[in-house]
């Protein structure tokens, strides 16, 4: 399980709320996952949806280092943009500085708006402007047909988030793979606030098989690629047999 710091379904009102949330991500969720034999990894940040209040964002950013030593923390994320606002850009830059200062992997959220392309370009420019940030250690999530090319061309990893109605459906994701190949790209799913299907990735694998893709190709996209990216964190433990 890879669980990024996320929006709570409402905007939190204080840094203490985030402190408690980070305790949940680094202490309670790993224990809960272990009851079912699952390793649990997490990412830390203040989500772009809550980045308009710069004062609150600075308070949250100040407490993140306290949790970065937790054994299940693999990086900073999911950072990025929601409305492409000036304040969101400021908080994004501060997150990138935090990641660069601590040699952390980066997980990026791209906006779900008509200006996703603009937001993705802004994010890539911020990442590339910091010489400490290596593209191969960053995954740009929620790519779609009009943004995946720029992400891969700049050397970053691309994540396709599979949803039944928004973001990217399984069939669209497979079409993208047929155009752009299966290097530095993966699929993911979620249990989200909106309509979502946690089993979307294995369902997509079945559709890939139906289209004639062989087992090795499918395994690379849905399993080996995520393992390759996550293994860049010294805290990620490769599954046995790989």
Predicted regions and their residues:
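Mid-to-C-terminal alpha-helical segments outside catalytic/metal-binding sites
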Residues: 202-242
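Catalytic pocket-lining loop regions of alpha/beta-barrel enzymes
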Residues: 93-178, 186
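Mid-domain alpha/beta scaffold segments of enzyme catalytic cores
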Residues: 1-106, 110, 114, 118-122, ...
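Short active-site-adjacent structural elements
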Residues: 167, 194-198, 230-231
């Amino acid at each position: 399980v890879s669980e990024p710091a996320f929006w709570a379904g409402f905007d939190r009102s204080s840094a203490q709320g985030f402190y408690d949330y980070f305790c949940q991500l680094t202490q309670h969720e790993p224990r809960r996952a272990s009851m079912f034999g699952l390793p649990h990894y997490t990412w830390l940040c203040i989500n772009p949806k809550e980045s308009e209040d710069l004062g609150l964002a600075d308070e949250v950013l100040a407490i993140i280092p306290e949790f970065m030593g937790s054994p299940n923390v693999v990086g900073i994320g999911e950072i990025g943009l929601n409305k492409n606002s000036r304040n969101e850009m400021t908080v994004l830059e501060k997150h990138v500085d935090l990641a660069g200062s601590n040699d952390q992997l980066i997980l990026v959220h791209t906006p779900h708006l008509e200006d996703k392309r603009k937001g993705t370009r802004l994010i890539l420019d911020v990442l590339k402007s910091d010489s400490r940030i290596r593209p191969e250690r960053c995954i740009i999530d929620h790519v779609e047909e009009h943004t995946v090319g720029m992400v891969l061309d700049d050397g970053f990893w691309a994540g396709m988030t599979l949803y039944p109605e928004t973001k990217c459906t399984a069939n669209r994701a497979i079409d993208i793979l047929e155009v752009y190949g299966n290097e530095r790209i993966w699929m993911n799913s979620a249990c989200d606030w909106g309509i979502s299907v946690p089993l979307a990735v294995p369902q997509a694998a079945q559709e890939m098989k139906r289209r004639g893709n062989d087992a090795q190709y499918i395994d690379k996209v849905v399993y080996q690629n995520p393992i390759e990216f996550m293994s860049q964190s010294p805290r990620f433990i490769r599954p046995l047999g790989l």
